[in-house]
Design a protein with these regions (language model features):
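Proline-centered linker/hinge motifs at extracellular inter-domain junctions
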Residues: 1, 231-235
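Surface-exposed, short loops/turns at beta-strand junctions within beta-sandwich domains
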Residues: 66-72, 219-221, 291-299
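Proteolytic-maturation and junctional protease-sensitive modules
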Residues: 169-225, 264, 273-274
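Proteolytic processing hotspots in large secreted/extracellular or virion-associated proteins
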Residues: 102, 108, 112-117, 147-194, ...
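Exoplasmic/lumenal beta-rich domain surfaces
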Residues: 3-66, 263-288, 293
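Conserved structural position at the C-terminal beta-strand
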Residues: 80, 304-306
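Short beta-strand elements
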Residues: 75, 83-109, 315-322
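Short edge beta-strand/loop segments characteristic of extracellular beta-sandwich folds
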Residues: 180-184, 250-258
């Protein structure tokens, strides 16, 4: 719990005793998200953003804004309390400066503003973005630019467009925005084309499929994007010795992919579909034998097909003996 007082008058309280699963992302509005991402510390806003729910704020007077008159002094106290009742207090005094010392900014009539209560769309060059109402928690200045793609990419990843910047990666989104980038892609690469997300000079898989000359992606992360193609199929590594009788109740495979990650997998024994259990943390899949369907002392044809998120496929087919 965090409380704020101005001259002993409570003007703000944040209290989160629990919330529904679908309210989880409102935590990005409770915090100052860019500062929190940059510092890896919890940074709490002592106000409520327009797009945040009221449930977390039992006390909120005038959005907790300080509005003293010229020359007026106020005593501010901030209390932070953990779940065990331990409390820290910060106190300081503020004084309203003369009006001539107030900050004044020159209005930029060319600036684009995203109203968080209304949908927003923008196209610049080959990149466009659509932001539905309610995606952002507050109005934002919109920025979009492009530049040559100069970053470290794996040799197996082909970069097929300039780099397009749409706002920043530390802009929190409550729901998804849609990013579309047009690019010429050779026909043989089109089934394997997607969007890459670039941060700190490295490209990672973002998603989306190439269709009608463009890649479209639904995303909760904005920042730097480019069109890329990945043509390297995933690797299948059996965790048992192929060709030797299998004496265990189960068999395990390790799946690896160079860029986009594993998209799907399926397996058959003598043409009959079998159940696989995936362990994403270890990058493995496991099949446990059913003695009634696959008795011991017989040989079977096992076929495992693995496809990555860019449509590259690997087939592992062997005869195994129980």
């Amino acid at each position: 719990r965090i409380r704020e007082f101005a001259d002993e008058d409570p003007i703000f309280e944040l209290r989160i005793d629990g919330f529904a699963f679908d309210q989880t992302r409102y935590c990005n509005a409770v915090t100052h998200y860019p500062m929190q991402v940059a510092s890896r510390n919890e940074v709490i806003r002592l106000t409520r953003l327009d797009g945040c729910i009221d449930d977390f704020y039992p006390v909120l007077k005038n959005q907790a804004l300080l509005t003293p008159s010229e020359g007026q002094s106020q005593q501010i106290r901030i209390e932070a309390e953990d779940d065990s009742g331990n409390r820290s207090i910060l106190e300081f005094r503020t004084i309203r400066q003369p009006a001539q010392r107030d900050f004044r900014a020159v209005c930029d009539s060319t600036a684009l503003i995203v109203d968080n209560r209304r949908p927003f769309s923008h196209t610049a060059g080959e990149a466009s973005v659509h932001i539905p109402a309610g995606v952002f928690y507050e109005p934002l200045f919109f920025s979009q630019s492009s530049r040559p793609a100069q970053f470290a990419a794996a040799p197996s990843v082909a970069v097929l467009s300039p780099l397009y910047s749409i706002l920043d990666y530390d802009t929190p989104l409550h729901t998804a925005a849609t990013v579309t980038i047009r690019a010429y892609v050779p026909q043989n690469l089109q089934p394997h084309t997607t969007l890459g997300f670039v941060r700190k000079g490295k490209v990672s898989y973002a998603g989306g499929k190439y269709k009608n000359g463009a890649v479209t992606l639904s995303t909760r992360t904005l920042g730097d994007f480019c069109v890329v193609a990945d043509t390297v199929p995933p690797r299948i590594e059996p965790r048992f010795k192929a060709g030797e009788p299998i004496r265990t109740r189960s068999i395990t495979f390790r799946l690896r992919d160079n860029f986009s990650g594993i998209g799907s997998y399926t397996a058959t024994l003598d043409g009959e579909w079998i159940l696989l259990e995936r362990n994403p943390m270890q990058g493995t899949i496991t099949h446990t034998f059913d003695d009634s369907r696959t008795p011991k002392g017989r040989s079977y044809t096992l076929q495992l097909t693995v496809t990555d998120n860019c449509g590259n496929k690997t087939v592992w087919k062997r005869t195994i003996t129980r």
